[in-house]
Amino acid sequence: MEDRGLIVKTSAYIDRHRDEMLSLWEKIVSIESGTPDKEGVDRVGAVLKDELESAGVETAVIPMERFGNLLTGVWNKEAAGQPIVLIGHMDTVFAKGT
């Protein structure tokens, strides 16, 4: 069942924050971060870590040797109910310089 109120609230939030969201995406996609480019992937991770922490998220970086570090974030650690897991990646398929 669709919660129309949640959809309306989410759409309104996106509309209010569109410019800052686009600015963040532009910053992230401007970083060369191909899979073998550990330094670039780690730079993307640092940007995301700062963003998450500014939103009150508890973060941790798990160092990796060959590829980009892993980044975890926990919201509302003490909240009741089942947790929700979001997973993503910070690398791209593009070679450095392309």
Q: How would you name each of these model-derived features?
A:
Residues 3-98:
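Acidic/His- and Gly-rich active-site-bordering loop/insert found
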